[in-house]
């Protein structure tokens, strides 16, 4: 029998007394001008579960009395009378949550309203998870509470993924469940499910043990551990300290003769597996906590994953620093984070990942605005998918004038600065190609934050060793912050690292691999460049999430990069070894891949707009900007195709007649100019921090008149088509949707 709850007046803080007279139950509480029972108090609110027995004390109860809950219609409740002083009824299955019920006593033809109560109806009540639930994978654990049923389902949620924990049984005071194999150490949300109903039970920390597994010491090893699936060791998994790479034995054990230089160790995720996730951060690394001469055990849990097909969201240059108007973190939350959580948080675990290509933070403001890597991590906690990261030049400690030392906070909060993982059948390698010099930096003093764009020799040695474990036919995706290449002039390619020798050092590591894609950021523009000297290497330099460092919202009510690309990210769709990609402008439909400019209107704006004329007159960085489009002919139209790359086609027709389309290599984008350069120049004496850059994906056509309508179609290398019917004249506006 379920435990009884006795509702006695002396224990109630707030109650409604039974009325004294009346013949209807709308305001008066006694039928037939007399009381059936007395001294009854019904609480104004109750938290109950269906099937729960509720006892009411009073005087005058009789065998045959019945209780109904009245909210419009009567809902009969099974009733028993223990004595003339105690009646018990059962909360019926039809009781509705957050409903005010009148508790009606029925006796033959008479009835009496005993009182009214707002009922909070739950699946279970008095649930106590405790702060920590300890146990082993496959072992039993208990949740205290009342109202559980053996047929209930228990759902656990960790890192955005929900999975079932089998219910073993239930009694009057608890529910017993089996800890599933895909549970992980750390915070966990618990949800009770019964049919179509769910109830959040709360959260607790899972403290899961390996059941006494101890990895034996080995001579010379300072780091040891086990790589396991639910406590069972996994053989042939690579583990590294950033200098050495080793492989687990048949028991899943590993040993590293480590100097602990990086003060951490990490697992190189094997295909078919995943790692647990905590607040969007993949748990693939562990910090060392003991000195270099002391042996410590660092264990790694893996989870099964069906991720041969997955989506990889590639984003870069968030530059979160608690500055700008509106604040950068507000723009980030309202734009990028909101869009990704809405679109991808409901995806199954192992189906969506994110790559962050660096400049998550902004070193210059770490100490001034109290916003550094920990705050940046908090800004993405709502992601129900993993965000894997590399560091950018702005993710270094600006008080430290050495590359390795300045990386310390990153290793502490984000993990290794270079590593690798297999997600599905793609081998991802995350590298660090900023050598942070930071001349003049010291504790309390921000240095010059200067850096070199190169891969250091230790990292290259590690990379060469890591690649010996990868089949040459495997597609390779390399993420790093700084680009390898840039454009020079009309389609020419130049080296963006320090020297050609730096290019050769990194790209020669991939000799024999046929499909190597580098994903980079740093520039805040879109560029796609085939390596001119390494046929197997293709680079995609991706525009920034922050656009122009979060400035254009203030001036243009938009978020635009210096080449006119709307701030955004790239979506990679992976099916086995096949990769496809599209640029996604934040806040715009993915079908929109370009913007058009009626250059007649642009030139008119340059010649007549008061703010533009003020900015041009200010000189400094705005000197000669009045001549931006002085050589552009009449009836010209510009088309900025944001993510254009080899294999795309741009076609334009006027009244059914095709127009000649030519690529323009040296012009600035009008949208960025009116969203930042002109208003900022006018307000700041012509001085610009982030001026428009030459756009390398601009196209031009010349129409036959100023008022014709143009039909424009852009087709990418995968057959995706974007179109616009451009009605002219078309006004120049900061609205990126136009």
Please provide the spans of the model-predicted regions.
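Short, acidic Ser/Thr/Gly-rich low-complexity loop/linker segments typical of extracellular
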Residues: 80, 168-171, 243-258
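Binuclear metal-dependent phosphoesterase catalytic core
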Residues: 537-643, 648-650, 696-703, 709-724
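Beta-strand/beta-sandwich contexts
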Residues: 24-63, 110-150, 199-214
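Extended active-site neighborhood of metal-dependent phosphoesterases/phosphodiesterases
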Residues: 271, 275-277, 283-287, 365-470, ...
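N-terminal active-site segment of His-dependent metallophosphoesterases
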Residues: 214-222, 229, 273-367, 738
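Short, ordered, surface-exposed loop/turn motifs in non-cytosolic proteins
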Residues: 151, 221-243
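Aromatic sugar-binding surface patches on proteins
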Residues: 81-90, 170-177, 669-700
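C-terminal motif of bacterial Sec signal peptides marking the signal peptidase cleavage site
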Residues: 18-22
């Amino acid at each position: 029998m379920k435990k009884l709850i006795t509702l006695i007046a002396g224990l109630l803080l707030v109650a409604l007394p039974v009325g004294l007279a009346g013949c209807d139950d709308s305001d008066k509480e006694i039928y037939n001008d007399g009381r059936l029972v007395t001294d009854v108090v019904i609480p104004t609110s109750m938290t109950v579960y269906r099937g729960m027995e509720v006892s009411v004390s009073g005087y005058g109860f009789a065998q045959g009395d019945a209780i109904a809950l009245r909210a419009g219609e009567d809902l009969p409740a099974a009733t028993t009378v223990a004595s003339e002083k105690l009646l018990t009824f059962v909360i019926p299955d039809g009781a509705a949550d957050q409903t005010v019920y009148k508790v009606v006593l029925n006796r033959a033809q008479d009835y009496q309203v005993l009182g009214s109560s707002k009922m909070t109806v739950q699946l279970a009540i008095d649930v106590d998870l405790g702060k920590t639930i300890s146990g082993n994978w496959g072992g039993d654990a208990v949740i205290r509470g009342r109202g559980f049923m053996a047929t209930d389902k228990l759902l656990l949620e960790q890192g955005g993924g929900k999975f079932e924990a089998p219910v073993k049984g239930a009694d009057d005071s608890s529910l017993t469940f089996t800890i599933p194999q895909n549970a992980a150490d750390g915070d966990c949300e618990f949800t009770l499910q019964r049919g179509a109903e769910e109830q959040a039970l709360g959260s607790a920390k899972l403290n899961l043990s390996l059941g006494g597994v101890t990895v034996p010491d080995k001579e010379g090893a300072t780091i040891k551990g086990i790589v396991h699936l639910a406590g069972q060791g996994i053989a042939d998994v690579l583990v590294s300290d950033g200098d050495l790479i080793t492989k687990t034995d048949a028991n899943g054990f590993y040993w590293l003769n480590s100097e602990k230089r990086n003060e951490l160790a990490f697992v190189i995720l094997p295909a078919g597996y995943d790692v647990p996730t905590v607040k969007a951060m993949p748990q693939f690394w562990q910090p060392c906590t003991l000195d270099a001469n002391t042996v410590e055990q660092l264990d790694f849990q893996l989870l099964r994953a069906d991720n041969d097909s997955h989506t990889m969201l590639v984003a870069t240059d968030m530059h979160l620093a608690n500055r700008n108007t509106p604040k950068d973190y507000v723009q980030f939350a309202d734009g990028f984070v909101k869009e990704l959580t809405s679109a991808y948080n409901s995806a199954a675990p192992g189906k969506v990942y994110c790559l962050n290509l660096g400049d998550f933070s902004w070193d210059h403001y770490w100490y001034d605005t109290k916003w550094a890597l920990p705050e940046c991590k908090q800004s993405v906690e709502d992601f129900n998918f993993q965000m894997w990261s590399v560091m950018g030049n702005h993710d270094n400690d600006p008080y430290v004038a050495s590359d390795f030392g300045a990386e310390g906070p990153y290793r502490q909060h984000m993990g290794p600065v270079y590593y690798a993982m297999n997600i599905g059948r793609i081998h991802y390698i995350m590298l660090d190609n900023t050598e942070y010099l930071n001349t003049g930096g010291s504790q309390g003093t921000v240095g010059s934050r200067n850096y070199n764009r190169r891969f250091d020799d230790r990292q290259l040695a590690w990379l060469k060793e890591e690649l010996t474990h990868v089949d040459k036919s495997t597609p390779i995706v390399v993420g790093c912050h700084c680009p390898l290449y840039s454009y020079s002039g009309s389609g020419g390619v130049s080296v963006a690292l320090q020297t050609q020798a730096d290019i050769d050092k990194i790209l020669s590591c991939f000799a024999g691999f046929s499909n190597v894609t580098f994903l980079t950021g740093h520039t805040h523009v879109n560029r796609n460049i085939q390596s001119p000297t390494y046929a197997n290497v293709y680079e995609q330099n991706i525009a920034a999430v922050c656009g122009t460092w979060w400035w254009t919202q203030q001036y243009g009510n938009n978020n635009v990069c210096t080449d006119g690309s709307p701030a955004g990210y790239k979506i990679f769709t992976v099916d086995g070894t096949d990769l496809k990609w599209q640029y996604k402008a934040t806040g715009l439909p993915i079908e929109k891949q370009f913007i058009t400019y009626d250059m007649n209107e642009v030139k008119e704006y340059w010649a007549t707009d008061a703010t533009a004329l003020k900015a041009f007159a200010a000189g400094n960085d705005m000197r000669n900007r009045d001549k931006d489009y002085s050589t552009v002919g009449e009836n010209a139209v510009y088309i900025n195709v944001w993510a254009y790359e080899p294999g795309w086609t741009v076609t334009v027709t006027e009244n059914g007649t095709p127009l000649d389309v030519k690529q323009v290599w040296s012009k600035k984008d009008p949208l960025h100019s009116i969203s930042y350069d002109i208003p900022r120049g006018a307000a700041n004496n012509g001085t610009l921090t982030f001026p428009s850059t030459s756009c390398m994906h601009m196209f031009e056509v010349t129409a036959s008149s100023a008022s014709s309508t143009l039909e424009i179609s852009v087709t990418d290398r995968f057959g995706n088509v974007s179109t616009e019917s451009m009605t002219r004249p078309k006004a120049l506006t900061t609205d990126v949707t136009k």
